[in-house]
Curated annotation (Swiss-Prot):
The modification Phosphoserine is found at residues 5-6, 9, 87, 90, 223, 283, 286. Induction: By retinoic acid. The gene is SKAP2. Ubiquitously expressed. Present in platelets (at protein level). This is Src kinase-associated phosphoprotein 2. Homodimer. Interacts with PTPNS1. Part of a complex consisting of SKAP2, FYB1 and PTPNS1. Part of a complex consisting of SKAP2, FYB1 and LILRB3. May interact with actin. Interacts with FYB1, which is required for SKAP2 protein stability. Interacts with LAT, GRB2, PTK2B and PRAM1. May interact with FYN, HCK and LYN. Interacts with FASLG. One of its GO terms (cellular component) is plasma membrane. SMART domains: PH, SH3. It comes from Homo sapiens. It is found in: Cytoplasm. Residues 66-88, 264-293 are annotated as: Disordered. The SH3 domain interacts with FYB1 and PTK2B. Residues 14-64 are annotated as: Homodimerization. Residues 297-358 form the SH3 domain.
Amino acid sequence: MPNPSSTSSPYPLPEEIRNLLADVETFVADILKGENLSKKAKEKRESLIKKIKDVKSIYLQEFQDKGDAEDGEEYDDPFAGPPDTISLASERYDKDDEAPSDGAQFPPIAAQDLPFVLKAGYLEKRRKDHSFLGFEWQKRWCALSKTVFYYYGSDKDKQQKGEFAIDGYSVRMNNTLRKDGKKDCCFEISAPDKRIYQFTAASPKDAEEWVQQLKFVLQDMESDIIPEDYDERGELYDDVDHPLPISNPLTSSQPIDDEIYEELPEEEEDSAPVKVEEQRKMSQDSVHHTSGDKSTDYANFYQGLWDCTGAFSDELSFKRGDVIYILSKEYNRYGWWVGEMKGAIGLVPKAYIMEMYDI
């Protein structure tokens, strides 16, 4: 056992040991830092931190170029192995998670004030570490607001730690980022000549949901299909160049609405309210044929404003923030639309939902 008082390493520190110390210090110094620990656990944490510092003092030669773990200065690891995909990509990581975003492109905004949040939750974000670890994973509250990805220390933060516009990026699952039990929970957002952002979700399912939501927005941004124009109330404007595929009545007291319905193919539109149940079934049978363009039908995605429990079997029940895809607005005059959520189709009160995207 080397003498702790020595100022240089008696022999090179094996890479496996350095990697182990990296994991231990990340867990003890960072992950446990914000946890509510018992007195005994806090004492043990401080003891482990001290032991790690002792090891660094013993192997001073190997760590002298890495600087103090708390000074925030960057370094290059002279003992790093041959470059691989991950190490090369790391040069494009967010080098300082606490620094302002690139070019101060977006103004500071509190996490609770973000508009049109499509997906939010806690993730572990990979970044360049400032100690001898090389890399670290830090817990961040992340949110996709419209087409901008924000990350915060917590969902109560008044200002983001960073953000980036996802335009031009691609997203994919990546199980090579970790070797522990969370390897199947990882995904990355990347683009040529831009920083790579890599995250770990709480579960593989959560990671897949992040990937699918990001892909949906990215595909919509790249699509040449222009969604139908809606006013602020979510009602459809008349298109003078093309006939409407289904009946979408305007909320208006003008009697000309009935004439519009009669000109459309669906004759059932003018049926009396007593036949609504039959129309509902026909509508729900037909909407399956119109949902194929869902990935690009940006304007028909809504989210719940309040919790709503359906009174009948043909009505959807949903919570505040739930994503609902609107399949039909043919019952607009009654205040109901036909929507789909998690594979279930039913009637949705339009007063209980709002547009997900600001078009």
